[in-house]
Amino acid sequence: MDKNIIIGAMTALITPFKNGKVDEQSYARLIKRQIENGIDAVVPVGTTGESATLTHEEHRTCIEIAVETCKGTKVKVLAGAGSNATHEAVGLAKFAKEHGADGILSVAPYYNKPTQQGLYEHYKAIAQSVDIPVLLYNVPGRTGCEISTDTIIKLFRDCENIYGVKEASGNIDKCVDLLAHEPRMMLISGEDAINYPILSNGGKGVISVTSNLLPDMISALTHFALDENYKEAKKINDELYNINKILFCESNPIPIKTAMYLAGLIESLEFRLPLCSPSKENFAKIEEVMKKYKIKGF
């Protein structure tokens, strides 16, 4: 299998709700907007997609909508398929594969704090259950466990279809260390604030929250960097600084969904508890940044 399979500019899709249910029409419309604005892949039902509060049926529906909407285009679907129970993660991975996803993104098991050996066996079981690309997802600030550099490299070398890692630890040194020890690995940025540093240090793509709102800018930033035009990439990165900052003023995806609502891109600003709407102060800050960027609706 070609391990360079799903790279470039990717969007961690939000999941719009309406009257307490997944707004399927809005979801498909958001994906079409990504397709039209230069995104290489969409990532349904990840952290930004509120996967933790979706039912398994809703999770599967979102994957099906993404696959159907991207059918016939060059845009790939990297479906979220993570769980803190290995058998559930395997089941989600198999569903994604059987329903046409091009690959899966699998977050490290959360809450139960497995050892590195447990993490290795967890991911090996997932990789062996499907024959599509698997991207590891390291986000210790949410999961409570870190996939070590050694474990990531061992999984990459032992499992043919594990092609890289989405790094959202905020640790640039770790990212550089990973590529120094295994330069064939596909390192993907999982934090908009460090997209440019990762891309300019050998990263091969981003999974962006900001690109829900500004897919064209994230696409341009990513492709300039991949073409080694770092001057233009940094210019765009600098332009995105303020909005990247405000889109993480509260827990993701609260700010990005608020921004999408203010821009008229989703009909209803709904979350599922324990997530809730932003504070009045942060709502006002998001509005102000939207005005500065002259985003649709302002």
Swiss-Prot record:
Protein purpose: Catalyzes the condensation of (S)-aspartate-beta-semialdehyde [(S)-ASA] and pyruvate to 4-hydroxy-tetrahydrodipicolinate (HTPA).
Respond yes or no to whether keyword Methyltransferase is given for this record.
no
Similarity comment text for this entry: Belongs to the DapA family.
Key word Cytoplasm present in the record?
A: yes
Protein name, UniProt field: 4-hydroxy-tetrahydrodipicolinate synthase
Which pairs of positions does the record mark as disulfide bonds? none
Subunit-level organization: Homotetramer; dimer of dimers.
Compartments where found: Cytoplasm
Q: Which Pfam families match?
A: DHDPS (PF00701)
SUPFAM superfamilies, alphabetized: Aldolase
GO terms (BP aspect): diaminopimelate biosynthetic process; lysine biosynthetic process via diaminopimelate
Q: In which pathway does it act?
A: Amino-acid biosynthesis; L-lysine biosynthesis via DAP pathway; (S)-tetrahydrodipicolinate from L-aspartate: step 3/4
Positions binding pyruvate in this chain are 48, 207
Q: Which GO terms describe its molecular function?
A: 4-hydroxy-tetrahydrodipicolinate synthase activity
Q: Which PROSITE patterns match?
A: DHDPS_1, DHDPS_2
Please indicate which residues carry the site annotation Part of a proton relay during catalysis.
47, 111
| EC nos | 4.3.3.7
What keywords are assigned to this protein? Amino-acid biosynthesis, Cytoplasm, Diaminopimelate biosynthesis, Lyase, Lysine biosynthesis, Schiff base
Q: Name one GO cellular component term.
A: cytosol
Q: Which CDD domains match?
A: DHDPS
